[in-house]
Amino acid sequence: MKSELNKIEHYLIHRDSLNKEVSKVAVAWHLDHSLKVINKIYDSLKDSNPDMYKNKFSTARTLSFTFGYIPRGKAAAPLSVQPPDTIMTADIVSQLVEAREKVRKIESLDDQSNFKHPVFGQLNKKQTKRFLEVHTKHHLKIVKSILKE
C-alpha cells in the first residue's frame, strides 16, 4: 500500500483534472474517496470483535481478489466514504498522513479483525488488506485514465 499512497500524493497536483468520458468526477474525488475507505475500514477492523468473524465464500470476492479487478461504474460508494461537494487539498493531505499511519498499524491487529463489505461480505484482516489494495488501484487506474497516462 505504500506505493499506492505515494501515487495518491503524486496525483494531488492534478486534483482538478476532469474527463467526463472517463468519470463524472475529478481526480480529487477519487483520491479523497480512496483515503476515506482506507481510514474508515481500518477503524472498523480496530473496533471489530475477532470472535465474531465467520468465513463465508463469496464468488464476487474471490474473482475480484484473484484478478485484482473491480469493474467500473458497477457500485456506488456508501455515503460514509463519499467525498464532500467541496474537496480541500489540505483535507486530502491530512487523510493521507492518517492513512499512512493506519496502514502501518494494521499489522498489529488480530488476524480475525473484520469488517463487513456491502458486496464481498465479512472480510478478515488479510482479506481486508487485499481489498484495500485492489480498491485503491482501481481508483488510481481511473485517475490515470482521466489524465490520459
Residue ranges and their predicted role:
Residues 96-117:
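Active-site oxyanion/phosphate-handling segment shared across diverse enzymes
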Residues 8-11, 15, 106-109, 146:
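A short secondary-structure junction motif
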Residues 1-2, 24-31, 85-96, 126-129:
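Amphipathic, non-membrane alpha-helical segments in soluble helical-bundle scaffolds
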Residues 4-11, 33, 37, 95, ...:
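Amphipathic, well-ordered alpha-helical segments in soluble domains
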Residues 14-15, 75-83, 116-119:
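A short small-residue
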Residues 17-65, 110-149:
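Short, contiguous alpha-helical
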Residues 44-96, 103:
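Short, helix-capping/interhelical loops that line the mouth of catalytic, cofactor-
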